[in-house]
Structures are given as structure tokens and as C-alpha cells.
Amino acid sequence: MEFHYVAQADLELLTSSNPPASASQSTGITGGSHRARPGPVHFIDKVTDKPSHSHPFALKENWNLNPEPSSPPSPLFLEAPSRQASQHHGASPGAGTSAGCPFEKCCSTEPCLSGLGDVGRGEAASLRARPGSGASRGQGPGSRVSCRRDLGKPLHAPAGFSAGEVHTTPLGNLGA
């Protein structure tokens, strides 16, 4: 049985509005932006009652440091083994979820798309895959489950993710 702890934090990259001359500027390379604000960061903390031999911290997506102003920034997914595996939280299966969604407190009326807004306000929510759902395939040591929020247009999805879909991916396949 696995539980997934999800939290979100906004991260802002502070840079000078008047940076010193660099090698790229001295050679005539221009067009770069010196103001960068990456999108929201989603932390997925894996809590399991089985020992995990995964990497202590794995980056799931590259940052888009210069997103277009009209488009929502891409999320960054991070995963780390639990620091307190004994803290298991979870509602009964089906409570507050939509049909076909494998997560507790993650989803609302739109399948696996809008529930991360609850987590995004700094509240911690524990997510549990329902037995018999699509997310139960491939679970066990070395796999993780996540869902992402659809912000209205396709996002640059990390390996093993699609906008608005839920997948399990063995840790060995993350770099593919």
C-alpha cells in the first residue's frame, strides 16, 4: 500500500535588472531575458510501508525560465522518499473524488485535473490510489503515481506524464 504526499510551493528566481556585462553580451549575443520566474513547483513525497531503494531526490522536468507571458508556466515535479513513513493520511476510497480518478482529495468534478488547487494553497493532502483504478497497475517498490492540473492548454510534460492523465512509471524509466 502506498500513499503520496503532495505539496506545492511557488519559487521565484531573483535576478538583477541591470546585470554586468557577460561573455555573451561582449560577443554580440542578445535577446535573453534577465527576469525569470519559473512556474509552480509540485513536490511529491512518496510514503510507503515497503522499503524504497530509489534515489533520494529525482528531478522530473526541466525548468522553463522564460515562459511566454500569455501562457501558464510549466510545473516542475520533484519526488523524494518519505521522511516520516509512519504518517499515513487518507480518506476512505471514493470520498471527494470523481469517477475514474485514483486519488483522494486530489480531484473534484473534473477527473484528475482540478484537485491540485487544494494542495496549491499550502495545504498538505495525502493521496491514495483506489484498488481497481488504472493507477494501481505497476504500483509497488520503485513506482510512483501523480496527477497534474490542466491549466487550459498543453504543458511540457515530464517523462511518463501527459496533461490531464494519470500514469505510473517505474523509476528505471524516468530518464526515457
From Swiss-Prot:
UniProt biased composition (Polar residues)? 15-28
- Specify the protein name: Uncharacterized protein ARRDC1-AS1
- Where are the residues of the annotated region Disordered? 15-100, 125-176
Write down the superkingdom of origin.
Eukaryota
Question: Which species does this protein come from?
Answer: Homo sapiens
Q: What is the lineage of its organism?
A: Eukaryota, Metazoa, Chordata, Craniata, Vertebrata
Record field: compositional bias (Basic and acidic residues): 43-52
